Amino acid sequence: MASFKIVIVCLALLVAVACARRRDMMSDDELDYHYSKRGIPCACDSDGPDIRSASLSGIVWMGSCPSGWKKCKSYYSIVADCCNQ
């Protein structure tokens, strides 16, 4: 029974290694596109005061906004910022 478990574990490892895909490197333009498509949308000050009708043009970034992005909310938060390009 122990040898059967060893065979199953070896097969599982073989499948895991065979199915692992190498991640391709992306250019900065592609990274900017993917960064803008991820995250949680947020309402910038320019979207208006009503959150229900706002277009949610910003994206929540943990910490602070990355280079090329600007903070679009007037309040200060230590944890995250609402940023847009």
Curated annotation (Swiss-Prot):
Disulfide bonds join 42-82, 44-72, 65-83. Expressed in ectodermal glands and in clumps outside of the extodermal layer. Is not expressed in nematocytes. In adult female tissues, shows similar expression levels in mesenteries (gametes-producing tissue), tentacles, pharynx and physa. Residues 1-20 form the signal peptide. Keywords: Cleavage on pair of basic residues, Disulfide bond, Ion channel impairing toxin, Neurotoxin, Secreted, Signal, Toxin, Voltage-gated sodium channel impairing toxin. Belongs to the sea anemone sodium channel inhibitory toxin family. Type II subfamily. Nv1 toxin seems to be encoded by 8 different genes. 4 of them code for identical precursors, whereas 4 others code for very similar precursors. In the genome draft, 6 additional loci are also correlated to Nv1 toxin, but they are not predicted to be functional genes. This high similarity may be explained by concerted evolution. This is N.vectensis toxin 1 6. The lineage of its organism: Eukaryota, Metazoa, Cnidaria, Anthozoa, Hexacorallia.
